[in-house]
Regions:
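C-terminal target-recognition/interaction regions appended to catalytic cores
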Residues: 2-3, 8, 254-452
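A generic secondary-structure signal for well-formed alpha-helical elements
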Residues: 65, 96, 142-145, 157-161, ...
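Proline-centered helix-kink/hinge sites
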Residues: 96-97, 130, 177, 415
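Class I S-adenosyl-L-methionine
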Residues: 82-89, 104-354
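Short, solvent-exposed loop/turn segments at secondary-structure junctions
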Residues: 34, 55, 97-99, 139-140, ...
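Conserved beta-strand scaffold positions in the cores of enzyme catalytic domains, especially
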Residues: 26, 50, 74-75, 164-166, ...
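Core alpha/beta nucleotide-donor-binding catalytic domains of modification enzymes
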Residues: 2-129, 135, 139-151
Length: 452
C-alpha cells in the first residue's frame, strides 16, 4: 500500500542530484519534526544544524535524525538568538509559524509575536547569504486581508539580495490524498547565474485515494453516478463549493451539522427519532436563521413569535419537545437556536466522515480534527437513498474510524521508518504542523537544479 504511494510521487526512489562539487548543505529553521529534512536528504543534501524550541518536537527530531555518525550536528536553539551561523551554508529552509495568518488561529498577522519571527528570518538570511531558501506558510498569508504583510515579507527578502517567488501548492497535486494548501516562498541569491531560472513544480500525474494510504478501509471500484446540476442543486449551484466537490456528482464525504443543508449533510434530526412535523420545524429554522431580517449575525436565534409566522399553527410544546431532545436550545431571551450551531463542532463529536474512495481528506491541523473515515464504501445512488444508506450502513453500524497518528504520518507523506512521538495527541499535533514531504521533495528538486 505505502509502496504504491511512494511510487506515485517518486519519493524514496529519487534520483539524487549529482554534483562534482561539494555536497549542498542546509540549515533546518523552525525544524519541527523534520518535514523539510527528509526530502532534502533524499536529494543528496546535508544538514549542518537545526533550530527548534519545542522540546517534544526536538525529541522526535533527534530520535529520527541524530545518530552516532552525526552526533556533532549543531543544535542552533532559538532563532531569535541566531545571527551569523558557525559555518557557511547553501540553503535555508523552514516552516515559519503560521498561526498569525491561519483560519485556525486568530489571524493577527505581524501583530502576533509569532508573526514577528519573520524579522528573525530576515536577519539570518542577510547575515549568512545562503544560495537559496525555502519558507513555508499557510495560504492565508496570500489572501487580500494579509497582502500588505506578504508584500513586507517579499520586499525584505528581495532587498537582502534575492530573486523571490511564491506560490500556493496543494498536497493532493503531489501524490497525497489530502486537500492541503500551503504557500511556499523561494529565493535564489541574485548573483547566481540561474537566479531567474526557478519555476515551481507542476502537479504530478496520477491519482490516489484514501484507501491507498489508510489501512483497514475497503477498496472499491464503484463508478460514480453523474447527475445534472438541476437535480443536485435545484438549478442554484452554491458559490462555496470546494475543489473536490464536483458539480455533477454527490460528495465523497458527509458533513455533520444543523446549520447547513445538502444531499450529503447529516442533521441531528436525521439521527434522532423525530416526526415529519419536527423535521419541518428544524428545516424552517435552518433556512431562516441566517437572514438579515432577523439579525446581523451569520446565524441568529429566532424568537417563538417569529417562528409562529413561519410555521403554521406552531405550538410552544413543539419547540419544548425539540429542546428536550437536545436539538434546539433557548438562548437567553433572544429565542431558539440549534444545540449544534457551529460547523467546526459537528454533531456528537463528528464533523465529517469521508468515504474510502474519496480523493482527499480535509487539511490536517495541529489542533486536531473531528473528521473520520468510513471503513466500507457505499454505491452512489440517487441523493435521498445515498444519504439513507450512509446513515444505516455506516453511521448506525459504526463502520467508521478516527484518524490515528500513523494515518496522519501517511497523509503527510512521512516514510514508514519515521518514529512518531509516543503520545498520540502530541504526535498528531506535530504531524499536523509539518510540511507534506512530497511537496517539498518536488519543490526542492526544482530549486536545487538552479543553484548547482
Amino acid at each position: 500500500m505505502y509502496a504504491q504511494q511512494l511510487e506515485l510521487f517518486e519519493l524514496f526512489n529519487p534520483n539524487p542530484i549529482k554534483t562534482s562539487r561539494s555536497q549542498l548543505t542546509f540549515v533546518d529553521l523552525f525544524a519541527g519534526i523534520g518535514g523539510f529534512r527528509i526530502p532534502l536528504e533524499e536529494l543528496g543534501c546535508k544538514c549542518l544544524g537545526y533550530s527548534e524550541i519545542d522540546k517534544k518536537a526536538i525529541q522526535t527530531y533527534r530520535d529520527n535524525f541524530i545518530k552516532d555518525a552525526n552526533s556533532d550536528e549543531v543544535y542552533l536553539g532559538d532563532i531569535t538568538n541566531l545571527n551569523q551561523l558557525p559555518f557557511p551554508i547553501d540553503v535555508l529552509v523552514g516552516g515559519v509559524p503560521c498561526q498569525p495568518w491561519s483560519i485556525a488561529g486568530k489571524m493577527q498577522g505581524l501583530d502576533d509575536p509569532r508573526g514577528k519571527l519573520w524579522t528573525d528570518v530576515f536577519r539570518v538570511v542577510t547575515a549568512n547569504r545562503p544560495k537559496a531558501f525555502i519558507f513555508e506558510n499557510v495560504k492565508g498569508l496570500t489572501e487580500p486581508r494579509n497582502i500588505e504583510s506578504l508584500k513586507y515579507i517579499i520586499n525584505n527578502l528581495t532587498s537582502s539580495g534575492y530573486v523571490v517567488k511564491y506560490e500556493v501548492l496543494n498536497s493532493y497535486d503531489f501524490g497525497l490524498p489530502q486537500d492541503r494548501d500551503r504557500m511556499f516562498i523561494v529565493g535564489i541569491r541574485n548573483d547566481l547565474e540561474r537566479c531567474w531560472g526557478f519555476t515551481f513544480p507542476k502537479p504530478i500525474e496520477g491519482a490516489i485515494k484514501l484507501y491507498d494510504v489508510i489501512p483497514g478501509i475497503q477498496r472499491s471500484n464503484f463508478r460514480k453516478q453523474k447527475f445534472s446540476p438541476t437535480v443536485l442543486f435545484d438549478g442554484k449551484i452554491p458559490g462555496s463549493r470546494g475543489r473536490f466537490q464536483k458539480l455533477d456528482e454527490l460528495n465523497d464525504f458527509f458533513l455533520f451539522t444543523d446549520i447547513r443543508d445538502g444531499h450529503t449533510t447529516i442533521h441531528s434530526w436525521d439521527l434522532i427519532e423525530t416526526t415529519s412535523r419536527e423535521k419541518l420545524i428544524c428545516q424552517t429554522i435552518m433556512k431562516n436563521r441566517r437572514k438579515n431580517i432577523y439579525g446581523e449575525k451569520d446565524g441568529n436565534p429566532l424568537q417563538f413569535k417569529v417562528l409562529a409566522t413561519l410555521i403554521p399553527e406552531l405550538k410552544q410544546t413543539e419547540i419544548d419537545n425539540l429542546v428536550d431532545k437536545e436539538i434546539l436550545r433557548s438562548v437567553d431571551d433572544k429565542g431558539y437556536d440549534f444545540v449544534n450551531s457551529k460547523i467546526s463542532s459537528g454533531i456528537n463529536g463528528i464533523s465529517k466522515i469521508f468515504l474510502p474512495h474519496a480523493d482527499a481528506i480535509a487539511t490536517l491541523t495541529a489542533t486536531g480534527t473531528r473528521d473520520f473515515v468510513a471503513t466500507i464504501s457505499i454505491q452512489c445512488q440517487e441523493p435521498l437513498a445515498y444519504k439513507e444508506t450512509f446513515i444505516r450502513e455506516i453511521y448506525q453500524k459504526k463502520n467508521f474510524q478516527p484518524l490515528t497518528a500513523q494515518d496522519y504520518a501517511k497523509l503527510q507523506g512521512f516514510p514508514e521508518w519515521f518514529k512518531i512521538y509516543e503520545n498520540e495527541t502530541t504526535a498528531k499535533h506535530q504531524l499536523g504542523n509539518a510540511v507534506s514531504i512530497p511537496v517539498v521533495y518536488h519543490l526542492a528538486k526544482a530549486l536545487l537544479e538552479n543553484i548547482l
